[in-house]
From Swiss-Prot:
InterPro entries in alphabetical order: FAM131
Compositional bias annotation for Acidic residues: 323-332
PANTHER family, per the entry: PROTEIN FAM131B, PROTEIN FAM131B-RELATED
Descriptive protein name: Protein FAM131B
Amino acid sequence: MDSTSSLHGSSLHRPSTEQTRTDFSWDGINLSMEDTTSILPKLKRNSNAYGIGALAKSSFSGISRSMKDHVTKPTAMGQGRVAHMIEWQGWGKTPAVQPQHSHESVRRDTDAYSDLSDGEKEARFLAGVMEQFAISEATLMAWSSMDGEDMSVNSTQEPLGCNYSDNYQELMDSQDALAQAPMDGWPHSYVSQGMYCLGSSDAWEASDQSLIASPATGSYLGPAFDDSQPSLHEMGPSQPASGYSALEPPPLLGGDTDWAPGVGAVDLARGPAEEEKRPLAPEEEEDAGCRDLESLSPREDPEMSTALSRKVSDVTSSGVQSFDEEEGEANN
């Protein structure tokens, strides 16, 4: 007990330098073992920072080296050395006659290749690869251009002939249909085919006696237009017209003759020859069509005009009347 107490006492009464040294050597270890919560996080933080810095440095060096090996170096060789190697090998020139001593030529080529540096060897390899790619690309482009020319020639030749034949066939069919149309149902058939248009919905009604049916002009005019136009007596002599029977076909649009449907054989005297030869303005042509129709529909005989309008209305409304009758019977 005395010895231990004397040791502790002597250690406490030592000079300051020795006390600090013993504190670092002994007491410091005791503190590190006791207060682990305050020292271990510092060590952990230092190790993490060092590891992250080393990892970043190694990663940056690795990335820079890989970029230099895979991007910078081939680009530099592609810009300068590849062209030089292509010119040095003499590609694109006519092949020379092979020498008799092939083994010696192979040996010289091998020696020349072995004397090259690593960059020149890589450039030579890249030049060969680029040559093969160029040959393949040129071949593909030649084939594709030939196929494109064939397709363009076929596409320009076929539509012209097809369109011409289709248009000609449609024209012939329309002409045959017009020639074979029944004469008795001429107003209804021509209106249904779109040859003439109706100016109003009640143009075919029999109650309105003042409506004017004008096949020559292709329209049907109401009483308002009839009132605005001058009468036949005010305009002067009658316009030329030729007679057509009910069995004869109607003239086409723009013809110089008129036809009265439903009226038997009507013979009208032609006007003077100079009236036929004189050119007419568009307004005068419309007036002439109206005057021709007025001359064909006599006003002094109301019974004939009533019969004419009734026949025309019966032709167009026969289908509607039959449908109404069937609907009424079904309702009853």
